[in-house]
């Protein structure tokens, strides 16, 4: 597996990868599905293009197998758009990609990595806690009414903020 910065030619494949990992029936193959929480899209080409400079992809001979964004902020990096091809989840791709993102963040001077996870996704939060992230106790509101993030099937969604010191 090779991990690299995304290129403009990756946009459509990234959209397909993210959608397959989080939305619809195909996402149920993996454990990151949000199909019971949200309908609609998870991302679109415009969003991917807007973060292209901060997008990291993992690929093997079959194509893209994972992606994430690592967005520089004041003294830290924000980790997001994390997706692994559903059939490969649980096989180490995500752990390798996360470790590389953390390495890059430290290399570029970030003191910590921050991310947000839907609060009801306890298995996902546990994944990050096992990798050294800490629940800050802070929550952020879910963007209800903004279909770019999907159409909620519940009215109790919020984000938990996780941080890992580098």
Label each region the model flagged.
Residues 111-125, 131-166:
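C-terminal "cap" of GNAT-fold acetyltransferases
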Residues 42-57, 78, 155-158:
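A short helix-loop-beta-strand connector motif used in the catalytic cores of GNAT acetyltransferases and
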Residues 82-89, 117-119:
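A short, internal acetyl-CoA/4′-phosphopantetheine-binding micro-motif in the GNAT/acyltransferase core
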Residues 84, 90-103, 130:
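Conserved acetyl-CoA-binding loop-helix of GNAT-fold acetyltransferases
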Residues 57, 63-71, 76-83:
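Conserved beta-strand in the GNAT
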Residues 2-16:
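A short beta-loop-alpha structural element at the N-terminal edge
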Residues 19-47:
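Conserved GNAT-fold acetyl-CoA-binding loop/helix
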